[in-house]
A protein has these predicted regions:
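Soluble catalytic regions of membrane-associated enzymes that act on cell-envelope
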Residues: 219-287
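Membrane-embedded alpha-helical bundles of multi-pass enzymes
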Residues: 2-220
Length: 287
């Protein structure tokens, strides 16, 4: 067998292995969202994904990203077929969201050409800021955007969630990615950006990642009531079961919630003390 054939087969095997690892990382990131809600999986999942793309050429990095993105998005938005009545929209939406990830990967691979961007801190900053930027972009475009799936959302019950009052979901998402890069660099088999004499660099990066995960817990979250009160009404319009049957008739779910809202507004018990706002549940609008 010729050397070229051996190298070609080795390259194909490496590409397949990277794609499989990307899929595992995508499923691991999915597990950080409900219903599993393992928020702590976000960081190792992203670190594993980053380890497959930060030293790969652009074509291979994009291939890994497609595997990672589709593995995360498809199970995360498995409710789409029920909502719109077709599986095609499910795959298209997952693919479009994955394309945003691909754009991010192309950008960060381009920044790796800069020598100054190869140090652990610089890489972490670039990856974190650009990830938060892509998150913000896909939350607003196309049309009104799709903010679902931000890596900030699983951190509600984690120490990193304490950053939300300071900088919103953008800061939380950036923090998750920043820590993930530090974790990835602490586990790197070889790292040309770290001088050989810095033998404690990797343990220091790992320690820094751990500290950054728990440090935001020191930020106090105020639970004091603001001046005045707000009377809130909760509306549950109900739907026919199975759910797909209700969503297959446009306007049925909205109509049910509208009738329940009118009944709530007409409740004699609320004449003297009317509510200030009525809350509808998620998925209450189907038109």
């Amino acid at each position: 067998m010729r050397t070229s054939q051996i190298l070609r087969r080795a390259s194909i095997a490496q590409t397949c292995a990277d794609a499989m690892i990307g899929a595992v990382a995508g499923l691991a990131l999915y597990s950080s969202f409900p219903p599993l809600g393992w928020w702590w999986m976000s960081i190792p999942a992203l670190a594993l994904f980053i380890s497959r793309i930060d030293e790969a050429r652009a074509p291979r990095a994009i291939g890994v990203t497609l595997s990672f993105g589709m593995s995360m998005w498809l199970p995360l938005i498995d409710w789409i077929p029920m909502a719109v009545g077709t599986r095609a929209a499910w795959f298209v939406l997952a693919f479009v969201q994955t394309l945003f990830l691909c754009a991010w990967v192309v950008f960060v691979r381009w920044t790796s050409l800069w020598r100054a961007a190869r140090s652990p801190l610089a890489q972490a900053l670039l990856y974190a800021i650009s990830w938060a930027g892509v998150d913000a972009a896909r939350s607003r475009w196309p049309w009104s955007g799709f903010p679902w799936g931000s890596v900030a959302l699983p951190q509600v019950d984690s120490p990193l969630g304490h950053l939300a009052p300071v900088g919103g979901t953008s800061l939380v998402a950036a923090a998750v990615v920043f820590i993930a890069v530090l974790l990835r660099r602490s586990c790197a088999g070889r790292d040309g950006a770290v001088a050989p004499e810095h033998r404690f660099s990797r343990p220091l990066l790992a320690l820094s990642a751990c500290v950054l995960v728990v440090a935001p817990a020191a930020i106090p979250l105020s639970n004091e009531a603001e001046a005045g009160t707000v009377r809130v009404g909760v509306v549950q319009g109900d739907i026919a079961l199975p759910g797909a049957q209700a969503y297959s008739h446009p306007g049925e779910v909205t109509g049910n919630n509208l009738r329940a809202s009118r009944a709530l507004a007409a409740d004699p018990a609320l004449v003297d003390k009317p509510i200030d706002v009525a809350l509808w549940g998620e998925g209450s609008v189907d038109r």
